[in-house]
Swiss-Prot record:
ATP binds at residues 16, 87-89, 97, 122-128. This is Phosphopantetheine adenylyltransferase. GO terms for biological process: coenzyme A biosynthetic process. Its main location: cytoplasm. GO terms for molecular function: ATP binding; pantetheine-phosphate adenylyltransferase activity. Homohexamer. InterPro entries: Cyt_trans-like (IPR004821), PPAT (IPR001980), Rossmann-like_a/b/a_fold (IPR014729). It is an enzyme of class 2 (transferase). The lineage of its organism: Bacteria, Bacillati, Chloroflexota, Dehalococcoidia, Dehalococcoidales.
Amino acid sequence: MIAIYPGRFDPVTLGHLSVARRASGFCDRLIIAVFDNPAKPGLFTAAERVDLIKQSVKDLPNVEVHSFSGLMVNFARRMGVSLIIRGLRVGADFEREMEMYVMNRRLDEGIELCCLFSEPQYQYLSASLIKEVVMLGGDSSGLISEHVADALKNKLASA
């Protein structure tokens, strides 16, 4: 089975990576798909986010990382995907994922959704919260990988 784990990953967190690692255990092939939205540019470019994730999952042989723009369902169809993986942190995530599930099923009935609950230590972790903590000089250890922390500090210093 080929699955896709889509997101912005700006930057990728240990919560994201936990979901990816767990999903890779039950998929033949997992595609981490970095959403590149020109209308809403992130701190990191799509290429930078792809590179940071590739460094983070290099020990997972069945995981690949790509960027995409446009509808995720169209990208998933092109990649032969049959399952969307999403991580759920808090209740608001469930509502948002349900909305997306209904729309994705309308666009392509052949793609299913699998939601994985975040591990407890990542329940309230978000990329935007991490950016704020690092920008204000806080410690990001245990929240993002060391190479991501270095890239984030460098990016914020040059912004």
